[in-house]
């Protein structure tokens, strides 16, 4: 660990699983086990989740073309959404917002997208600040450009009836 006392990470993003980890000295880990409030509701990863996480790590290490395709998709969608005037914030991951800033509209837009067989999550208060409601877009390496373009086209159409 060197000069860093603690490293935390999640398996729910790039690994596509659940759970997370803490890497630290044995002494700090013991302290966290006994005194971290969040540990009360924690449980060990199931064997299935552990196997999935290990397989995801293997794919990340041995299949760089998957990561390359992911970032090609992410960059394409970011560019297209920005060209169409959508506020996508400043996230640097494959999961990023499309800012709506209205709780009611977020759910209306998500429903309209779902009718078009496009799934995005609506995120509202208290998960984000008031007036920071957003759609959460998760770009995958398995998406094709045509699918990303369908999202952009749908959002442009929906914005005509639900301005955001």
Residue ranges of predicted features:
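Conserved PLP-binding catalytic core of the aspartate aminotransferase-like
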Residues: 68-77, 82-117, 127, 131-132, ...
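PLP-dependent enzyme catalytic core of the Aspartate aminotransferase-like
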Residues: 115-118, 127-164
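Cytosolic Rossmann-like ligand/nucleotide-binding regulatory domains
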Residues: 123-124
